[in-house]
A protein has these predicted regions:
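Structural beta-sheet core signal
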Residues: 2, 75, 98, 134-136
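Catalytic P-loop NTPase motifs of RecA-like helicase/translocase cores
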Residues: 9-10, 80-82, 104-106, 120, ...
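Short glycine-/polar-rich loops that comprise or flank the Walker A/P-loop
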Residues: 92-96, 127-132, 159-162
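Inter-motif core of Ras-like GTPase G domains
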Residues: 68, 84-104
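Beta-strand-loop-alpha "switch" segments that mediate conformational coupling across diverse proteins
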Residues: 138-170
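Generic structural signal for small/hydrophobic residues in well-ordered secondary structure
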Residues: 11-12, 94, 113, 167
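Conserved C-terminal guanine-recognition region of P-loop GTPase G domains, centered on the G4
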Residues: 110-128
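P-loop/Walker-type NTP enzyme "switch/lid" segment
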Residues: 1-73, 79
Length: 170
């Protein structure tokens, strides 16, 4: 399941609405969707539209009403810590996955976030977070891997965990 807290754009929820519109308006897409879900023997994962303040309550409500309980609930949070409720909600996450791209500003921002969160909330016991992982997104195959290696060394020097998976630029 996904709780889309990235108010006001709610891009994940918007994508699902777009998908549902395509399926509802096209017998071709309706047949594809039916065949897909019949083949995998599962329904589409639930997406709940929320905000950072109400995210945890909305997630609990969703879990309580689902016939099949999700194994994992992902929370898509706003990109700024200044948004209401973000820090409080993040402090209740078991794991945090932070996207980074090969842009100096993005990397510095991610480093500042991870250091601040770790130093002020995790090590003090105020957060229940078990781990924070960075992952590369918007990876352009034409970019030199040296850039990723350089940033990778910087992350390693700070003992930050980086997932091996890199999401390509779409």
């Amino acid at each position: 399941a996904v709780v889309d807290c990235d108010d006001p754009q709610h891009s994940i929820h918007g994508l699902r609405e777009h998908e549902m519109g395509l399926i509802d308006s096209s017998t071709y897409f309706k047949a594809l969707a039916c065949d897909h879900f019949r083949r995998i023997k599962k329904n589409a994962y639930t997406i709940v539209k929320s905000n950072a303040v109400n995210a945890l309550d909305d997630a609990e409500r969703m879990i309580a009403t689902e016939d099949v309980k999700p194994d994992v609930v992902f929370f898509d949070m706003p990109g700024t810590l200044r948004s209401n409720g973000v820090i409080k909600t993040l402090s209740q996450m078991d794991y945090i996955f932070t996207p980074v791209s090969a842009d100096r500003f993005v990397v510095e921002s991610a480093l500042q976030f991870v250091m601040m969160f770790n130093d002020n909330l995790v090590t003090t016991g105020l957060a229940k977070t078990k781990g924070i992982s960075l992952f590369w997104t918007m990876v352009d195959g034409r970019e030199k891997t040296g850039l990723y290696d350089l940033y990778g060394k910087l992350f390693a020097e700070n003992d930050f965990h980086v997932l091996d998976t890199r999401l390509p630029d779409s």
